[in-house]
């Protein structure tokens, strides 16, 4: 009898210990859950308070810069709409915009100076086409410069022979079709360099990169675009002159456009720089293309949304292109797509953890 009572007591003691252990685990779990959600609420509350201060605080300049930058991104516009009315946002964007050009490129202003450096009669060539070109010490026809300003850093690639610059594109277009990353696009064409290209469908920043928007000419073929519809056309004609302007796809074909995409805005047309309200835009990663009077092509990519490089405005792009002698220049797709590849290396990277898939790119062919 005594043994039975003792055994029963042991069982009860063990049950109590198990219950206490379960209670401790449950208490720890509840505390951890409360801490996690409390931390999330504090962080979220702090973030919303920061957005409130930026958008409704004492500095209109910071507010305008934030709004203009966020509205240019795929998903950032949601943050802007939390505290500002549509009318306020529209006014801010209008006060930081780039005016459209009504004219297109006068191709007679560009005189292609490049000549084949292997020509026997090198005495008749411009220095831009010879091996002793001071801008091209290694003789590969490409020079890359570092560019930087108060809010940005990036690279300017100068390609001395404009006939080497083409539009690379994927084989099939479609909303569900996958695009190619820039390194893969450059590899597809066995090119030596490349930058991202034109506009494409990217709803909420999660698109497949397989559907261009606007116009696409690649190696003389109209791959995308209605011949009767008007587009912003940025690309090269059969004389290797960069053409910048608003025109129909049919007109573009009639003037011999061989490689072109759509984006915008135009930055410089016929030596005239775009007129701007405010800074012309927000600060973001940027990609742009230009051409000098001697025909050399300017490929510019600016890093952004990083602690070391917030990004560039349209006014910054115009200034850079002016400094490098552009007579025509245009803004291309930017943001998370902005990147530059050279000799198999991504020398300017996207601001995301992974490379974006895109349908078009300006690629630089290898020399024969």
Can you name each region flagged by the protein language model?
Residues 154-158, 233, 266, 288, ...:
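Conserved hydrophobic/aromatic beta-strand scaffold that supports enzyme active sites
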Residues 193-197, 244, 269, 328-334:
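General beta-strand structural signal in soluble alpha/beta enzymes
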Residues 170-177, 248-252, 302-306:
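Short, solvent-exposed aromatic-acidic interface loops
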Residues 160-163, 235-241, 269-270, 291-295, ...:
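Short acidic-glycine loop/turn motifs at beta-strand connectors
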Residues 152-154, 188-190, 229-231, 262, ...:
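Extracytoplasmic
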Residues 206-227, 277-327, 332, 337-368:
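Conserved, well-ordered active-site substructure
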Residues 3-225:
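Zymogen propeptides
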Residues 200-279:
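Active-site-adjacent helix-turn-beta-strand microarchitecture at beta-sheet edges
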């Amino acid at each position: 009898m005594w043994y039975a009572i003792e055994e029963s007591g042991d069982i009860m003691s063990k049950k109590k210990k198990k219950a206490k252990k379960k209670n401790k685990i449950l208490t720890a779990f509840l505390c951890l859950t409360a801490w996690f959600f409390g931390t999330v609420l504090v962080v979220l509350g702090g973030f919303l308070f920061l957005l409130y201060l930026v958008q409704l605080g004492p500095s209109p300049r910071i507010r305008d810069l934030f709004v203009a930058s966020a509205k240019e991104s795929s998903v950032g516009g949601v943050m802007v709409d939390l505290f500002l009315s549509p009318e306020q946002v529209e006014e801010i964007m209008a006060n930081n915009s780039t005016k459209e050009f009504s004219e297109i490129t006068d191709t007679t202003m560009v005189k292609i100076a490049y000549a084949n450096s292997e020509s026997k009669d090198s005495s008749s060539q411009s220095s831009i086409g010879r091996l002793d070109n001071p801008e091209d010490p290694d003789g590969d026809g490409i020079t890359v410069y570092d560019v930087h300003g108060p809010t940005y850093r990036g690279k300017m690639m100068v390609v001395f022979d404009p006939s080497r610059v083409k539009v690379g594109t994927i084989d099939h277009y479609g909303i569900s079709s996958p695009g190619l990353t820039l390194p893969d696009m450059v590899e597809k064409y066995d090119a030596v360099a490349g930058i991202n290209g034109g506009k494409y469908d990217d709803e909420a920043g999660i698109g497949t990169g397989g559907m261009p928007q606007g116009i696409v000419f690649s190696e003389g073929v109209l791959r995308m675009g209605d011949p009767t519809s008007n587009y912003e056309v940025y690309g090269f004609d059969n004389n290797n002159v960069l053409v910048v302007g608003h025109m129909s796809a049919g007109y573009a074909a009639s003037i011999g456009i061989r490689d072109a995409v759509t984006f915008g805005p135009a930055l410089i047309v016929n030596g005239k720089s775009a007129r701007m309200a405010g800074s012309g835009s927000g600060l973001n990663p940027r990609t742009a293309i230009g051409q000098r009077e001697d025909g050399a092509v300017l490929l510019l990519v600016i890093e952004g949304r990083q602690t070391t490089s917030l990004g560039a405005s349209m006014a910054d792009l115009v200034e850079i292109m002016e400094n490098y002698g552009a007579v025509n220049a245009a803004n291309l797709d930017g943001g998370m797509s902005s990147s530059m590849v050279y000799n198999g290396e991504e020398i300017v990277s996207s601001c995301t953890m992974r490379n974006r898939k895109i349908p078009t790119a300006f690629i630089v062919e290898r020399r024969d």
